[in-house]
Each structure stands twice: as structure tokens, then as C-alpha cells.
Swiss-Prot record:
GO molecular function: monooxygenase activity
Summary of subunit composition and partner proteins: The propane 2-monooxygenase multicomponent enzyme system is composed of an electron transfer component and a monooxygenase component interacting with the effector protein PrmD. The electron transfer component is composed of a reductase (PrmB), and the monooxygenase component is formed by a large subunit (PrmA) and a small subunit (PrmC).
Top-level lineage group: Bacteria
Induction: By propane.
Entry similarity comment: Belongs to the TmoD/XamoD family.
Lineage of the species this protein comes from: Bacteria, Bacillati, Actinomycetota, Actinomycetes, Mycobacteriales
Protein name as catalogued: Propane 2-monooxygenase, effector component
Pfam families given in the database record: MmoB_DmpM
Function comment: Effector component of the propane 2-monooxygenase multicomponent enzyme system which is involved in the degradation of propane via the O2-dependent hydroxylation of propane.
Entry-linked SUPFAM superfamilies: Monooxygenase (hydroxylase) regulatory protein
Length: 113
């Protein structure tokens, strides 16, 4: 396990969230880690989920993997910090690296005034 610290002014095209390292958090991380462009970093009490461009936490997919209901309230319970634009919908939570990609969900006006 290595930790990287630092800052950069360039756009990273990354977004991510920290999940609690609990039985539910671990299953959610495993489902997300199986997706292309997603990297997991495990710590004793948390799991970082970092993705390129978009992270899509599909509640139906997570419900199937867990064998019990998963929804936005459970996502909020197992997550703490995040980076990127987070959008909660009835059926999923989305994290976008770019506000332009999230524009239709967050009311971000892309036209020049």
C-alpha cells in the first residue's frame, strides 16, 4: 500500500469516493473495482474508489451483489469524502470528473452569457 500526496493544476479526469470498510462497503467496492477504469485502494478502516471520468453506483446492481436492498440512504451511510460532481438519482449515484459531463443533471449552463 502506497500513499501519494501532492497537488496539480491540470485536469485529472478522475473522480472518487471513500467508503467505510464494512461488509456492505467491501461488497460495493468489489463491484465497483470490477469496472473498467476503476481503482481501489484499501486502508484498515476505509476503501478509496477512484475512477476515470465517471463512477456509476447502480443500486440494482449493488442490491443483486449484496442480496439485500441498496439505495441512496445506504450509499450515504457507507460513504464519506468524495471528489467530483456527485449526483443522486432514484436508481443510482453518479460521480463525474468534469462538471460539463454532469451539466444535464446539475443545471450547469454550458452556454456563454
Amino acid at each position: 500500500m502506497s500513499m501519494q500526496f501532492g497537488s496539480s493544476t491540470e485536469f485529472s479526469n478522475m473522480c472518487g469516493v471513500t467508503l467505510m470498510n464494512t461488509p456492505i462497503g467491501r461488497v460495493v467496492a468489489e463491484v465497483m473495482g470490477a469496472k473498467d477504469g476503476v481503482e481501489l485502494t484499501e486502508y484498515p478502516s476505509m476503501i478509496r474508489v477512484d475512477g476515470q471520468r465517471l463512477l456509476d453506483f447502480d443500486y440494482e446492481e449493488l442490491t443483486d451483489a449484496l442480496g439485500q436492498e441498496f439505495d441512496g440512504s445506504i450509499f450515504e451511510e457507507i460513504s464519506s469524502t468524495h471528489y467530483g460532481r456527485m449526483v443522486h438519482l432514484d436508481e443510482k449515484t453518479l460521480l463525474f470528473a468534469s462538471p460539463e459531463d454532469a451539466a444535464e443533471y446539475i443545471g450547469f449552463d454550458l452556454t456563454a452569457q
